[in-house]
């Protein structure tokens, strides 16, 4: 069964590039440019994994991730991406149980590897 990945990214170029790469790897991809739309898509589609920018309009990624956990997505792997170098973000993501954390610009192959690994771990422990 094809796995579904939700990409929450407000930069259209990054969102499209990420979606194309994930689709080429065999995943079904949904995209949202803000946290509110991302929450709605998650609730309706129940993705297997979420890739989320930390800084988005209408919903800071960390807050959206916490809200998703509260709504029953505690076991859904989340990989964070960010252009920010603020101290404490990586730790905050880890405290939310992040499956990965990548600073932009990131290596697309490493991100894809983290997606594969998170989905395998999730599949075997579910």
Residue ranges, per PLM feature:
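Active-site beta3 strand of CheY-like receiver
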Residues: 45-51, 56
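C-terminal output helix
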Residues: 106-116
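Alpha4 helix (beta4-alpha4-beta5 surface) of REC/receiver domains from two-component response regulators
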Residues: 63, 85-102, 113
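Acidic catalytic/metal-coordinating carboxylates
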Residues: 34-37, 60-64
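Charged docking surfaces used in two-component/phosphorelay signaling
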Residues: 16-24
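Conserved acidic carboxylate
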Residues: 9
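The feature encodes the CheY-like receiver
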Residues: 15, 57-58, 71, 86, ...
